[in-house]
């Protein structure tokens, strides 16, 4: 009889797969195709599993005796199992002291193993609840972060509005107002308008220099106001 095959807890090194998925192989269509979906059973960590198995399998399906009833309180049963493990461990120590070679030692070890299996099984039954709570907490954190971001944005918006209002209040009353002719006409242009535009080009060129000077004066006045605001304590 050969020696039992050692099963590694880690997957095999991926180098044998990386060499097959080079850029050249992918472009030429020579890269191996993904394996087909598993339909029946598969091996994981040396154990065989069925695809339709439950995530948390019942104890009876694993050939393990159930120590608690079908309807029970998880918290109460976990406390009882914890106390039973402690008592059985003390009994095992007493057996090791009095008669180390007794058969009762193996019985106590099996009892402890069964108790630990039940503890892990009850803890695993809390996994769906733990996943829901983790998702709930994560969504609450995201909601709080978004609300804080919106609040900071609102504060910055109010500050900008206040600064603009202060700038408008600080402007002197004798600044020249923008002329109505500077507004851009957005309506569709007909044939008469296009003819009028050709006649108005020369007049607009004459006024463009004067308007440019006015815009420069306004920019200079705004720069002076901003400098004065920055110098204020």
Curated annotation (Swiss-Prot):
Record's keyword terms, sorted: Activator, Isopeptide bond, Nucleus, Phosphoprotein, Transcription, Transcription regulation, Ubl conjugation
Modified residues (Phosphoserine): 194
Biological processes, Gene Ontology terms: positive regulation of transcription elongation by RNA polymerase II; positive regulation of transcription initiation by RNA polymerase II; protein ubiquitination; regulation of transcription by RNA polymerase II; RNA polymerase II preinitiation complex assembly; somatic stem cell population maintenance; transcription initiation at RNA polymerase II promoter
GO cellular component annotations of the record: core mediator complex; mediator complex; nuclear body; nucleoplasm; nucleus; transcription regulator complex; ubiquitin ligase complex
Region Disordered: start-end pairs: 187-213
GO function term, MF aspect, one: ubiquitin protein ligase activity
InterPro entries cross-referenced by the UniProt entry: Immune_Mod/Transcr_Coactivator, Med7/Med21-like, Mediatior_Med7, Mediatior_Med7_sf
Localization per record: Nucleus
Record location of the Glycyl lysine isopeptide (Lys-Gly) (interchain with G-Cter in SUMO2) cross-link: 185
UniProt superkingdom: Eukaryota
Post-translational modification note: Constitutively sumoylated.
Subunit structure: Component of the Mediator complex, which is composed of MED1, MED4, MED6, MED7, MED8, MED9, MED10, MED11, MED12, MED13, MED13L, MED14, MED15, MED16, MED17, MED18, MED19, MED20, MED21, MED22, MED23, MED24, MED25, MED26, MED27, MED29, MED30, MED31, CCNC, CDK8 and CDC2L6/CDK11. The MED12, MED13, CCNC and CDK8 subunits form a distinct module termed the CDK8 module. Mediator containing the CDK8 module is less active than Mediator lacking this module in supporting transcriptional activation.
Protein name, entry field: Mediator of RNA polymerase II transcription subunit 7
